[in-house]
């Protein structure tokens, strides 16, 4: 029954994508003198302005996975920008390099915000975007970043974190968070243990944030990435694993979340 449901969702998405005229465009922009290389996607057949969504990449860097998610958002009727948080489009091809690149940005929130906000400006300037309706989604490292930007008080309608770590050195303060928050995490993700989830909930409650946390039982880290199992085997990281059910359900939750925060039907 579940396989049948997943197939129906996939077919519906494929049909919608076929009707859309999704365009993709590489863009270069700057933050603090560093060249950043992003990717914009939008439905060229759609008339009028629409919400804009930033896509923040995994710890591997701005790659095809982030671009594919941007195109998927465009097919839903949004204009999406897959940003570059590392600079010059740098990508990591080994976990050691990915960890260092991620740490350099994660541990410097001033730098992270500078590069994130540069992406917001690019997105807002696109002629298809209603610059008052901006959200952000992030995967793994990207999930960390969107939550940190929400904690910093960025003026976003909402953020969605997919299998991102929830710990922070700068907890949200009451009245500071403007964005609504959606956290989608795996119940078998050792990088986001149950105690971390509970700590995050306490943080959000204390700061009076409008948030929701959904845990997918049995889902490992990177459960949305179809290459997760291959990467896990390649680098002997048992924590990685794709989960088709959690992938489909979390994407559907994000769509419902966007309908709510943008107050319009998609």
Question: What is each stretch, according to the model?
Answer:
Residues 26-126, 226-240:
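Serine-hydrolase catalytic machinery in alpha/beta-hydrolase-like enzymes
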Residues 69, 193-203:
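Short alpha-helix in the alpha/beta-hydrolase fold that links the catalytic acid
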């Amino acid at each position: 029954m579940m396989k049948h449901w997943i197939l129906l969702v996939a077919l519906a998405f494929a049909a919608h994508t076929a009707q859309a005229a999704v365009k993709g465009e590489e863009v270069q922009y700057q933050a603090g003198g560093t060249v950043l290389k992003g990717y914009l996607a939008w439905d060229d057949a759609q008339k009028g302005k629409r919400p804009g969504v930033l896509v923040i990449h995994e710890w591997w860097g701005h790659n095809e996975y982030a671009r594919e998610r941007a195109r998927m958002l465009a097919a839903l009727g949004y204009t999406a920008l897959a940003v570059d948080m590392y600079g010059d489009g740098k990508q990591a091809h080994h976990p050691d390099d990915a960890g260092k690149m991620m740490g350099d940005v994660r541990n410097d929130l001033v730098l992270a915000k500078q590069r994130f906000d540069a992406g917001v400006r690019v997105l807002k300037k696109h002629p298809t975007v209603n610059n008052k309706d901006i959200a952000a989604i992030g995967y793994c490292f990207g999930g960390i970043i969107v939550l940190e930007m929400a904690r910093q008080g960025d003026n976003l309608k909402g953020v969605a974190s997919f299998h991102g770590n929830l710990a922070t050195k700068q907890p949200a303060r009451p009245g500071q968070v403007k964005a609504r928050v959606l956290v989608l995490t795996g119940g078998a993700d050792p990088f986001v243990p149950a105690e971390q989830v509970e700590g995050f909930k306490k943080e959000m409650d204390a700061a009076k944030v409008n948030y929701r946390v959904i845990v997918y039982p049995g889902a490992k880290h990177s459960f949305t990435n179809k290459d997760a199992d291959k990467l896990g085997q390649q680098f002997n990281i048992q924590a990685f694993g794709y989960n088709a059910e959690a992938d489909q359900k979390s994407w559907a939750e994000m769509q419902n979340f966007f309908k709510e925060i943008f107050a319009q039907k998609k």
